[in-house]
């Protein structure tokens, strides 16, 4: 028997999601073969439900018995007066999983309506349309690289994403307790090369994905680093490649735009690696409230997010293509 409240999401985000989703599956599926596993999940449904005291017992079955209602009221008032306490109250008093206080995206931000990403639904939305490809390459291919394909349609942004690591890094990710085998099995990650990712694998994925869903990619956003080979090949195919400036003024509007779309449920994606990277994102904030993503934080990879942001840059930097990309 194991009892736990929610907590802050650190490097074990993906592992937590595996067990939480397993619990949800067992609860909802009467025909589950897991007869010796009985999950009991007490949580409030949404953050907004905290405003009504009658909802508090959902996450606190011992309220009025062990836990005092007066203490709960005091904590909620403290949270409203001091936003810095919000994450702690949400996790410890309402059993909502939250990201670390320094992270740019909240756990609630990155959730996607499961009906939007059912098999065939996401793919159906992006089929036979225009889109943007983008990628983020690691230093010499020695660690994770990522690519995204973005499609704007019906006021929403749809994203397909894949990541690659060299075989030499496989054990490192396993040691971090990440469900890397599940990611690979489900096609969200692939091993490429022995000590360095082979960039032609990324290039081929872009071509294959566009062919599979009849997507016409007219633009590509990317980081200049180590990109010469891939950019040349894409440009030879008539794709306009635009390097995103990795600066605070360059990154800040992209991060705010992505967060706004997520909070408005208009950014649709199905990659658990992209979710992990979003939750890993920590930012530096300047006096103008511009934000800049911190890179090279051990165990907090953000490559899938960066690849996606470069696609946002291509959209933003080429408004003349908006008519094509919205159809």
Regions found by a protein language model. Give the residues of each.
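A short acidic (Asp/Glu
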Residues: 11-16, 142-146, 228-236, 253-256
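Long, compositionally biased intrinsically disordered regions
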Residues: 64-76, 127-128, 157-160, 203, ...
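Acidic, metal-ligating active-site segments
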Residues: 141-155, 304, 310-311
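Nucleic-acid-processing active sites and adjacent nucleic-acid-binding tracks
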Residues: 151-217
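Short His-Asn-centered micro-motif
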Residues: 4, 221-224, 244
């Amino acid at each position: 028997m194991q009892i736990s409240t929610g907590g802050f999401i650190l490097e074990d985000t993906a592992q937590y999601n595996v067990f939480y989703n397993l619990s949800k599956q067992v609860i909802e599926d009467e025909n589950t073969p897991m007869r010796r596993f009985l999950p009991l999940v007490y949580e409030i449904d949404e953050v907004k439900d905290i405003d009504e005291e009658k909802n508090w017992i959902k996450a606190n079955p011992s309220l009025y018995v062990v836990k005092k209602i007066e203490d709960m009221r005091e904590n909620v008032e403290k949270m409203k007066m001091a936003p810095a306490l919000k994450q702690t109250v949400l996790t410890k008093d309402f059993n909502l999983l939250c990201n670390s206080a320094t992270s740019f995206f909240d756990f609630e931000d990155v959730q996607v309506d499961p009906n939007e990403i059912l098999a065939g639904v996401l793919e159906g939305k992006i089929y036979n349309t225009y889109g943007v490809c983008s990628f983020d390459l690691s230093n010499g291919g020695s660690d994770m690289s990522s690519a995204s394909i973005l499609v704007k349609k019906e006021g929403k942004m749809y994203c397909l994403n894949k990541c690659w690591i060299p075989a030499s890094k496989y054990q490192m990710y396993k040691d971090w307790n990440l469900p890397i085998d599940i990611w690979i099995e489900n096609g969200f990650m692939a091993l490429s090369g022995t000590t360095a990712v082979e960039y032609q694998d990324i290039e081929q994925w872009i071509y294959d994905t566009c062919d599979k869903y009849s997507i016409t990619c007219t633009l590509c956003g990317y980081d200049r680093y180590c990109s010469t080979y891939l950019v040349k090949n894409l440009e030879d195919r008539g794709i306009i490649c635009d390097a995103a400036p990795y600066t605070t003024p360059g990154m800040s509007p992209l991060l705010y735009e992505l967060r706004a779309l997520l909070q408005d449920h208009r950014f649709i994606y199905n990659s658990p690696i992209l979710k992990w990277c979003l939750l890993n994102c920590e930012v530096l904030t300047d006096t103008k409230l511009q934000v800049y993503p911190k890179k090279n934080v051990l165990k907090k990879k953000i490559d899938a997010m960066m690849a996606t942001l470069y696609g946002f840059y291509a959209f933003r930097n080429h408004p003349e293509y908006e008519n094509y990309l919205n159809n």
